[in-house]
Every structure is written in C-alpha cells, then in structure tokens.
Amino acid sequence: MSQRTEHNGSWLRNAGSLLSVLACVAVLASPASATPASAAAAATPRTDDYLKRAERILKFTPLIDGHNDLPNFIRKTTKNQIYEGKIPFEDELPGHTDLKRLRKGRVGGQFWSVYTPCPDPPVPIDDPTWSVRDTLEQIDVTKRLIEKYSRDLQFCGDARCARRAFRRGKIASFLGIEGGHQIGNSLGDLRRVYELGVRYITVTHNCDNAFATAQSTVADGLPDTGLMKPFGIEFVKEMNRLGMLVDLSHVSANTMRDTLKVARAPVIFSHSSAYAVSNHLRNVPDDVLKEVAKNNGVVMVTFVSRFVNVENPDAADINTVVDHIFHIAKVAGWDHVGIGGDYDGTVYLPKGLEDVSKYPHLIARVLERGATTQQVRKLVGENILRVWTEVERIAKRLQKTELPNEAYWEGRNWTRPAKRDLNADFEGRSVPLFTSASNGDFCD
C-alpha cells in the first residue's frame, strides 16, 4: 500500500469516528433522551400544579374560616346601612372581603364576627354601656346582609346546615361574638344571643370582663389571673350546655389553661397562631396546644402580620402562615388545626394573603410543603365541622339533665339610681309611692 493510500485510509477511519461522536452528541441532545436528572426535574410538580390540586380539594371540601370582621367594616363605613347601593357586596369593596373575592377564594363557610369594641377604660365591668345594644345591631346587620344576598349566602346555626349549604353552592354563614362584654357579662343574655343565631363567643376581647382575663391585660404588665372563679366556670358550663362554641382567641394563657380544665366540650381558637413560632401573647403556647388535642378542639390560624411575625411584621408572608400551620399540626396533630384569617379586622396582612381570594394559594403552599390531601381537608373545614358537631351532641345530652344556669357575677348591681326623684311626680300623697331602694327599679 502506498503512503498516500495509507494516509487516505487513516483519514476515513478518523472521519468515521468523528461522525460517530457527532451522532452520539445529537442523540444525547435530543429531548427524547433526557438524563435521569432532567427527567426528575420535569416530573417535579410546579406551583401551578399545586394550585390546581388545591382548587380540586376546595371544590369538594368546604373551606370554613373562623373569623371575618366585615360586619364591623360595614358599621364603620355606612353606619350599618346596606341598601340602595351603600354596600355593593357583589362588586369589589375597599376592604378585604366581597362576594366576588369570596367566590374566587373558594370560601365554603364563614364565621362573621358581630364585634363591638370593649368599653373605654376605666369603665368598671358592671357599668352600664351600650355594648349589648351595639351587639344586637351587629347581629341584625349581618343577618340582613345574608338575607339580601341569599342567592350566594345561607345563614346556618349548625354543622349539618353548613354541609347542606356547601352542597347547594352557597357560602354557609355563621355568627360569632368577640368578647363577654358584648353580652353584658350575663348568662341570660348569653342564652338570648344563642336564640338569635350566635354560635361562638370569644371569652374576652382586649379587656377583662366578669368571666376571664384578656391577653392584653398581661401585655400591660398586670397579673394573669386566668378564668374568674366561680363565675367564669359557670359561663363555660352554660356555653357547653347551650351548644355555644367556646372561643379562646384573645384570652390570656392562664385563661386558656383554666378553661381547658373545666370545659365539657371541645373548644376553638377562632383566629390565633403558634406562640413557639412567634411569641406574641395572642398566640397559643405549646403546652396549651397539647391540651387542645386532648380536648379534641381546633386552633384556627390567623394571618395578622404582627401576630405571625412579632419581630418583623413587614417580613411576614404566606410561607410564615404555613410555618404556623405545620407547627400546630406537629404539636397537636392535623386533627386540631384550621384557618381563621381575621380579614377586615386588620390592615396588616402577610404578602400573598392580601384578601379572601388568596385561600387557594395558601392551600397550594401547604400541599407543596408536604401535606396530604386528607390533611388539607381537615385543615380547611373538616376539623371545625367535627368540633361543632361534637359540641352539639354534648349539648343535647347536657340539656336532658341540666336547667339553664342562673349564676350571676357577685359584683353586679341589681338596681340603678334614678335620674330624678320619682316621688316628685306624686306630691300630696301621705305615703311615698317609691322608696329610695326601689327608685331605680322602674323604667318609666
């Protein structure tokens, strides 16, 4: 073989090798032959996939939020006038809540707070205030709103109604009172508001009352005396007998502990988060979370920025709330965690949870963090419905053997001084018509 022929053969062999290498490179570069690593990446669910999964869950499981302050928003903005376009609920309201966003958020049930503020200090517990009147007005406006938008909302007074309303495509609507001051510290008024449809009472708001100590008192550096004895105990007992949910949001840590010792039915926290994650006194300590699990109750996680991130509220975001959900699930179990956003009760909300339309995004993040479909179903609604059903069952049993509780606060005044001398209306009588002790008993 000549030197030239030998050179040509060598070139052909080299060219063949090069073509083989290029062919391999082409095959490796083609989409059909992805590496195991790239295949795994392609199989990883995206955020959109979790959101679709969340939407599917909320299509078949009612999302029930424990606390929304829309009624107070209405009171402050329109003085409870809702007709003639004053509250265009079907359109976008300036707050966090309206019908359009509730539907977008897949809300299946809502506890509407018929909140009225604590009396300004230093009003004594038994001083006459307008709290009960204002509470009745808030019950009235909320029920009128539900009736006005009855195509979309349905008033409910029990857990079965909530499920029926959801199956009919309506948003089940319930009432909650935020503080014992709203019933005038009276067990008689407790029974009356139950008759009007209220189904939970927060034991205190940001003030002590005849029943218990508020967390705000402890925040001010005063002692945590817990549940007031004996009247606070009688209050809890009567709520259990009625079937009224006992709500421990806003109360002091010792009030939480004392109540859990005497409660005969599961309790709720309508809008509180985990103290171990953010050490704000509005949140629930781990020892209490464990007792809630024993009690078969539920803690409904709130979204308020300064509660979920006490050190840096501006940094609070949707993942911060997920942290609270998972902590409560870890300590108490997935059977004892729920959602209570506190929309329209605050102006400071985490990034990603700006209004009621954002619930599916929260559920998507919970799924992305590793929660199962069954765990999410418990979180969004099954837990609070289980608790409510159990409270109703226990109440029926207690009502067979117990009469309405006639206890009263030992510091209460049973008469009030008259504004004028009633005897002056009856001058000339030989015997005064009214004695000084009875002057305040007449309401002419």
UniProtKB/Swiss-Prot annotation:
Region forming the signal peptide: 1-34
Binding site for substrate: 205, 282, 342
Source organism (scientific name): Coccidioides posadasii (strain RMSCC 757 / Silveira)
Family statement: Belongs to the metallo-dependent hydrolases superfamily. Peptidase M19 family.
GO molecular function: metal ion binding; metallodipeptidase activity
Pfam families linked to this entry: Peptidase_M19 (PF01244)
PANTHER family, A to Z: DIPEPTIDASE, MICROSOMAL DIPEPTIDASE
Keywords: Dipeptidase, Disulfide bond, Glycoprotein, Hydrolase, Metal-binding, Metalloprotease, Protease, Signal, Zinc
GO terms of biological process kind: proteolysis
Glycosylation-annotated residues: 413
Keyword Zinc recorded: yes
Protein role: Hydrolyzes a wide range of dipeptides.
Binding site for Zn(2+) 1: 67, 69, 178
InterPro entries: Dipep_AS, Metal_Hydrolase, Pept_M19
Transmembrane regions listed in the UniProt entry: none
Binding site for Zn(2+) 2: 178, 250, 271
Catalyzed reactions per annotation: an L-aminoacyl-L-amino acid + H2O = 2 an L-alpha-amino acid
Disulphide bonds in the chain: 118-207
CDD domains named in the record: rDP_like
EC code: 3.4.13.19
Top EC class of this enzyme: hydrolase
Protein name: Putative dipeptidase CPSG_03667
Cofactor(s) for this UniProt protein: Zn(2+)
